[in-house]
From Swiss-Prot:
Primary gene name: ispE
Active site: 13, 146
Name under which the protein is recorded: 4-diphosphocytidyl-2-C-methyl-D-erythritol kinase
Origin species: Hahella chejuensis (strain KCTC 2396)
EC numbers on record: 2.7.1.148
Lineage: Bacteria, Pseudomonadati, Pseudomonadota, Gammaproteobacteria, Oceanospirillales
Pathway of action: Isoprenoid biosynthesis; isopentenyl diphosphate biosynthesis via DXP pathway; isopentenyl diphosphate from 1-deoxy-D-xylulose 5-phosphate: step 3/6
UniProt KW keywords: ATP-binding, Isoprene biosynthesis, Kinase, Nucleotide-binding, Transferase
An MF annotation (GO) of this entry: ATP binding
């Protein structure tokens, strides 16, 4: 095992649309969505330790360590290796993890899920576990429905509970992502009795052709009813380009053909909001970073 620090990106995602097409007997929702990766996000650094401790700095406000997806991902991977490859268990060291956090929590842009995926990918490499992507994605699904798309590292059309992924190439666009400084509970939205749960299944074609007019986020109506501040933010952004919610929020977004226009709108954003401009990408930077690490 190389005793040096591995630093990897942890990109954001948008749900360009989100259709809820049914509900399974176990309570999980069937959905269709287009996960669009962005060239903006957190970064995580992993440094092997001489002991067996797994530590994270800085700790995230309001998130107990046991509930942090980064720590949970590290422990899950360690348990999996110990159970399935006892011969490799001796290679597992402790690890100090440092996060440079840019993405808001509870924003619907995949911050926690992306962090978990990056942790699985990083420690698989640091611990020389040689676990394939399929298995890592399955482990990721235990942590959250959005984790597998980040493990696979590609913009994708998703079905099932978000775990059946079809990689796609989307047209390059610039996005302005606005966070109205609210935290929205995904569980609260998905349990709301007024949530649309019977949207007819769509094909992948409209999403790829950019025909988002006929696609929507089924959570948006419920979220806007519960949180009028989200409707207010959407109305503001709508002045410049059609805006919509990503995931269950709280972030909203709009697309622009060029960076300059997106940055101009960002400069006009009310000070009560936070926001950033990012370019769409079809492949996660983590994949290339891991290749460079291997060749380093």
């Amino acid at each position: 095992m190389r005793n040096e620090t591995l630093t990897l990106s942890s990109p954001a995602k948008l749900n360009l649309f989100l259709h809820i097409t049914g509900r399974r007997p176990d309570g999980y929702h069937e959905l269709q969505t287009l996960f669009q990766l962005l060239d903006y996000g957190d970064s995580l650094s992993f440094t092997p330790r001489d002991d067996q401790r797994i530590t994270l700095e800085p700790s995230l406000p309001g998130v107990p360590e046991a509930d942090n997806l980064i720590i949970k991902a590290a422990r899950l991977l360690k348990e999996h290796i110990t159970a399935t490859s006892p011969d490799k268990a001796g290679q597992i060291s402790g690890v100090s993890i440092y996060i440079n956090k840019k993405l808001p929590m509870g924003g619907g842009i995949g911050g926690g899920s992306s962090n978990a995926a990056t942790t699985l990918l990083a420690l698989n490499r640091l611990w020389n576990a040689d676990i394939n992507t399929e298995t890592l994605a399955a482990l990721g699904l235990k942590l959250g429905a959005d984790v597998p798309v980040f493990v696979r590292g590609a913009t994708a059309f998703a079905e099932g509970v978000g775990d059946i992924l079809h990689p796609v190439d989307t047209q390059e666009k610039w996005y302005l992502v606005v966070h109205p400084n609210l935290h929205i509970s995904t569980a609260k939205i998905f349990s709301d009795k007024w949530l649309t749960r019977d949207t007819p299944k769509s094909t992948i074609a409209p999403a790829l052709e950019g025909d988002l007019e006929n696609l929507r986020n089924d959570c948006e109506t419920v979220v806007c009813r519960m949180y009028p501040e989200i409707r207010e933010a959407i109305n503001w952004l709508d002045q410049f380009s059609p805006a919509r919610l990503t995931g269950t929020g709280a972030c909203i977004f709009a697309s622009f053909s060029d960076k300059k226009r997106a940055e101009y709108v960002l400069s006009q954003m009310p000070t009560k909001y936070q926001g950033f401009v990012a370019k769409s990408i079809n492949e996660s930077p983590v994949l290339n970073e891991l290749k460079q690490w291997r060749n380093h």
